[in-house]
């Protein structure tokens, strides 16, 4: 800002001619005086700027919240080039205003606010750190004991998880047992799982039938429900019955199952799936009708053109040539191109 103003005044001749020694008039300030007033923040000017303008020098820098703050232009000078010397205040009044402005801020370093919140990292006490190390060492020793006991008795990690489900009603996966033995679980989860595994170790030592229970549970878990396959003849019969009665009662389901030689659950599930399929089909059909009612994105309509010979991806039309559907842009009446028969389309002819 100062450099811009100085450059503007550098090309304006001082009133009265000469080099400006004739004096200053209202509305104009000597650029040399203006430049002398602009010094380093908080420091003295290059020349007699403050003395010439009749103001007290800028007070020194003061500390503010751990940093250095400097005073800016004081005593409400505004744009100095637009203010004449006659309108400047005396030195006493200017100094008083500077003092009044500086009284609002303390020259001492600012103290901490009483309501200031300090975020400090909470470090555990030596006792807590010792307890944590002792707990981690105990978990490490128990994990080694569990792995040794499991291998000695011939249990797999999956067997341990299934046995916990038989004993306590909650099955744990093989991955969980593996991570516990490898100390890869969080400390919270390790502490939750440790009592259950301790009871498993006791049961494994005292109960000889635990291995048989584990094997039976493994067979139950391994038994998967096979996918039911229905013959085409039976499927057509079910489809015919569905058209007559989409939602049969329990007695009707039992009668249909006995008639077709199927289980009642199979018939019930088939009718339920068939109703859901019908709902999806009706929704798709309604969406298709709405799409056709609103019209295609291209107003010209669909036109089929034969594709050139060669391999094409798609389903052939039972020996008929492949066609592709294109949308033509409608032309105004009287401006359409004459129709060209399909047989006339072929390779371009070159004239000599």
UniProtKB/Swiss-Prot annotation:
Tissue distribution: Expressed the totipotent and pluripotent stem cells of the pregastrulation embryo. Also expressed in primordial germ cells and in the female germ line. Absent from adult tissues.
Gene Ontology MF, one: ubiquitin protein ligase binding
Applied relevance: POU5F1/OCT4, SOX2, MYC/c-Myc and KLF4 are the four Yamanaka factors. When combined, these factors are sufficient to reprogram differentiated cells to an embryonic-like state designated iPS (induced pluripotent stem) cells. iPS cells exhibit the morphology and growth properties of ES cells and express ES cell marker genes.
Positions of post-translational Phosphothreonine modification: 228
Region called Disordered, residue ranges: 1-48, 91-115
Effect of residue 210 to A: No change in DNA binding. Loss of self-renewal ability in iPS cells. No change in nuclear location. No loss of ability to bind SOX2. Reduced levels of CHD4 and SMARCA4 in a POU5F1 pulldown assay
Composition bias, Polar residues: 99-108
Location of the POU-specific domain: 131-205
Result for mutant: residue 347 to A: Absence of phosphorylation. Reduced protein degradation. Reduced self-renewal ability in ES cells. No change in FBXW4 binding. Loss of FBXW8 binding
PROSITE patterns: HOMEOBOX_1, HOMEOBOX_2, POU_1, POU_2, POU_3
Ranges where the record places region DNA-binding: 173-179, 186-189
Claim: tRNA processing is one of the keywords in the record: no
SMART domains: HOX, POU
Induction: Repressed by retinoic acid (RA). Expression is activated by NR5A2 epiblast stage of development. Upon cell differentiation, expression is repressed by NR6A1.
Reported modifications of this chain: Sumoylation enhances the protein stability, DNA binding and transactivation activity. Sumoylation is required for enhanced YES1 expression.
Localization (cell): Cytoplasm; Nucleus
Annotated effect of mutating residue 209 to A: No change in DNA binding. Reduced self-renewal ability in iPS cells. No change in nuclear location
DNA-binding region ranges: 223-282
Effect annotated for changing residue 166 to K: No change in DNA binding. No loss of self-renewal ability in iPS cells. No change in nuclear location
Phosphoserine: modified positions: 106, 229, 282, 347
Record text about domains: The POU-specific domain mediates interaction with PKM.
Family to which the UniProt record says this protein belongs: Belongs to the POU transcription factor family. Class-5 subfamily.
Function summary: Transcription factor that binds to the octamer motif (5'-ATTTGCAT-3'). Forms a trimeric complex with SOX2 or SOX15 on DNA and controls the expression of a number of genes involved in embryonic development such as YES1, FGF4, UTF1 and ZFP206. Critical for early embryogenesis and for embryonic stem cell pluripotency.
Description of how the protein assembles with itself and partners: Interacts with PKM. Interacts with WWP2. Interacts with UBE2I and ZSCAN10. Interacts with PCGF1. Interacts with ESRRB; recruits ESRRB near the POU5F1-SOX2 element in the NANOG proximal promoter; the interaction is DNA independent. Interacts with ZNF322. Interacts with MAPK8 and MAPK9; the interaction allows MAPK8 and MAPK9 to phosphorylate POU5F1 on Ser-347. Interacts (when phosphorylated on Ser-347) with FBXW8. Interacts with FBXW4. Interacts with SOX2 and SOX15; binds synergistically with either SOX2 or SOX15 to DNA. Interacts with DDX56.
The protein's name in its UniProt record: POU domain, class 5, transcription factor 1
Species annotation: Mus musculus
